[in-house]
Amino acid sequence: MTGVQTCALPIYLKQRGEPNTPEAIASHETIQFGAITASPDWRFVEDGREVRVTCTPRFITNSADAAIQYAEAGGGLTRVMFYQAADALRRGRLRIVLAKFEQPPLPIHLVYPTSRLLSAKVRTFIDLVTGISEWHFGER
């Protein structure tokens, strides 16, 4: 399971203030990660209901790495999957904000044909992904 995380550079948060509610994002710079045609709305959950916050991104990219690097440079808040930001979070280069408002984690599935003739490459990939899933895709 993995989920979307809103995060930013700790120094950025110190300078601009840490948002305590989804609506507080309106006063922050945002970095939009996703398809270029994706909605600028960021979705959260508050008291069991979905809350949408429309952002005017400072930077739009379809690369998680670019969004993370820009956030690490102080560009603002970004939303990426937990596993994509795991290294930056672990090293303290980014910090999660609004965690209690994030949507539930998304399940990750590996789909492959059941067969005694499963290729060695597929078997190795399955073993690799399931072996690192707790570290790489762990829940908050």
Name each model feature, range by range:
Residues 1-9:
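Short, small-residue-biased leader/transition segments that mark boundaries at the very start
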Residues 12-20, 116-120:
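Short helix-loop capping/hinge motifs at secondary-structure junctions, enriched
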Residues 22-44:
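Short loop->beta-strand "edge-of-pocket" segments that line small-molecule binding or catalytic clefts
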Residues 23, 68-69, 123:
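Alpha-helical segments flanking ligand/cofactor-binding loops in enzyme cores
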Residues 32, 53-63, 101:
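Short beta-strand-to-loop elements that line the ligand-binding cleft
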Residues 41-54:
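Ligand-binding cleft/hinge of the Venus flytrap
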Residues 68-93:
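A ligand-binding cleft/hinge motif common to bilobed small-molecule-binding domains
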Residues 82-91, 100-140:
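C-terminal effector-binding regulatory domain of bacterial HTH transcription factors
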